[in-house]
Amino acid sequence: MNLTAYRDLSPAALRERIRQGEFDGPTAGLANGYAQANLMIVRRELAYDFLLFCQRNPKPCPLLDVTDPGSFEPRHAAPGADIRTDFPRYRIYRNGELDQEVQDITPFWEDDMVAFLIGCSFSFEAALLANGVPVRHIEDGHNVPMYRTNIACQPAGGLSGPMVVSMRPMPANKVVRAVQVTSRFPSVHGAPVHVGDPRLLGIADLAKPDFGEPSELREGEVPVFWACGVTPQAVAMQARPELVITHAPGHMFITDLRDEQLGVI
């Protein structure tokens, strides 16, 4: 998909294109300067447990917004937007199994549903680029690679599961700067959780991500791993609630929140 026509659109204009079905691809590199968000939608009966899960696991699940039960408007992150239509792609999980992937969840929406918007590391990629740190999946025009790890999240109620991480390869001499830059943005995962040998995270093969597409690791480069907001999907697969709706990995919500609003220093 050619992203040129979409790169300079405002968040509202980009959401409108998505709502109309014009754009349904990964959102890395779009709406630079604005925060992007992952999605987890649960029924009200599970909402407190998931809120507690996020509170106990802020690295993979930093909350940007939570809707009122039955409301599909993220009033803090993007007033006037519609959670049901404004992501490029969604996933429907039933009893822990991926049932289908769709572009509009209006037919699946229920009056007691609560939506959680979770910060996404796409949000700090403009800052990485501005500081001379390359972002391979943007360079190569593909989705970021994501992996399940052997790091167990802190459970909450009946929710438990492994942390998922995203990976960005970079020259070894850029790693310190990448840590410095991303540490400013804890609301979108902050500093990396691991640098170097993927086997220490239980990742056997970087060429076979669990979500997204692989990035080439070139000579002299180091893999750098950040906690990822796809973690709730791994939790849904393990906890097996009757119905959960998420974004499709890499297909994020474009908020009206400026990256710099989320910076802490």
Curated annotation (Swiss-Prot):
Entry GO MF terms: lyase activity
Sorted UniProt keywords: Lyase
Superkingdom of source: Bacteria
Pfam families (UniProt xref): D-Glu_cyclase
Record's keyword annotation contains Lyase: yes
Membrane-spanning segments: none
PANTHER family reported for this sequence: D-GLUTAMATE CYCLASE, MITOCHONDRIAL
Family of the protein in this entry: Belongs to the D-glutamate cyclase family.
Name of the molecule in the record: Putative hydro-lyase PST_2764
